[in-house]
Amino acid sequence: MHMDDFSASLGFTDRSSRGILDTIEMIEKYRLDIRTVTMGISLLECARGSMEETATAVYDRVTSQAARLVEVCEGIERELGIPIVNKRISVTPIALVTAGCSGDPVDVARALDKAAKDVGVNFIGGYSALVEKGGTTSDIRLIRSIPEALSTTDVVCGSVNVASSRAGINMNAVNEMGKVVKQAAELTKDRSAIACAKLVVFANSVGDNPFMAGAFHGIEEPDCVVSVGVSGPGVVSRALGNLQGATLDQVAEEIKKAAFKITRTGQLVGAMASERLGVPFGIVDLSLAPTAEVGDSVANILEVMGLDQVGTHGTTAALALLNDAVKKGGMMACSRVGGLSGSFIPVSEDKGMIDAVRTGAISIDKLEAMTAICSVGLDMIAIPGDTPAETISGMIADEAAIGVMNHKTTAVRVIPVPGTVPGDEVDFGGLLGYAPVIPVNTVGNSEFIHRGGFIPAPVHGFRN
């Protein structure tokens, strides 16, 4: 594909030299990239009588289906000149696959890890359970195996859905997940509690999310599908750089135009990958995904709008404007939009968020408020190592309540790094970045968490 054709696909219909140069500038100077091409694979056909046989079937299925994924993505990168940062796989929630098996589900986690490494992908997600209305024997067994599974593998990611707007919040699962997070941290204490960076606790999880660590291949999905997650915070920041004095509705209009171009890129890459791999094209996830590099920050976009630093009063409103404009621009560019589709605010993966935590401009309470707007929730936040399991469960319950009451996906991915106190810094390496340890509320909540049971669904969740 020639660069003028690529430029036209982004919305530069005049195919002018300006459009071509603008495209090149977005890629080279403003870090426009495809954050992930994720292949979703159904493993329902892999269930066998024993865990060992199931693990073998899972390995064979993943390696055969994804054999050409990395090769195809690298070919598209060379052809278009646009980086595809990650190639990933999501699979059917493993608690469903192992429901009829005797044995230890960690065997399947290790098979997934080996399969992912053998085909060359960065991560594989789906060591997951869906327990918003209660857990089966298989669900409970998998949840209790998560600390070992994530601490003894390198690229396997896990998630648990504990709530939905139709079912309410499963507080028994919330209580359990606080303990699981603490155990996972303890088992990887010599590696900055890295297992916790691969574990997400959801409300209203979705089965077509291409982003890690919360990706899994939903049971409503086909046998195999390829989806795309875009990036491009730098492109949006650049678009707003010339708007000094503009009104906020003008700012929103400019964000929509930038989101259109970013999403068009994702749709083009997804369509090419789908055709070359011979599998259906799933969705483009519109989420703006930052990195810890300078010029690739969602927080910086909010500051370009006029905030002296993210975290001050007005931050949630600025994030609402950004999130809505990204969705509107992206939906005009692609008819197959899905996943989480909004703005990610992971602390360790966003230079602006890291700086705000360092200076005390943003607190965990403000981060919680922002999650009422953004795609995910309390994401990649390092907290003190002595934080009790009940406090973590309280964070999960609060996030689930926001998601359930607002019919949106929310999640918690916090990392209680053993031996750390507020102000320490933790380096997770690579795309996961680094983060200052943020203070948390130390007032107790254990009686509330230990009550268990369910928080009922809201009345507006009953829509039939």
From Swiss-Prot:
Disulfide bonds: none annotated. Coiled coil: none annotated. Pfam families: DUF711. InterPro entries: UPF0210 (IPR007841). Belongs to the UPF0210 family. PANTHER family: UPF0210 PROTEIN MJ1665, UPF0210 PROTEIN SPR0218. Homodimer. HAMAP family: UPF0210 (MF_01221). This is UPF0210 protein Cgl1545/cg1743. It comes from Corynebacterium glutamicum (strain ATCC 13032 / DSM 20300 / JCM 1318 / BCRC 11384 / CCUG 27702 / LMG 3730 / NBRC 12168 / NCIMB 10025 / NRRL B-2784 / 534). The lineage of its organism: Bacteria, Bacillati, Actinomycetota, Actinomycetes, Mycobacteriales.
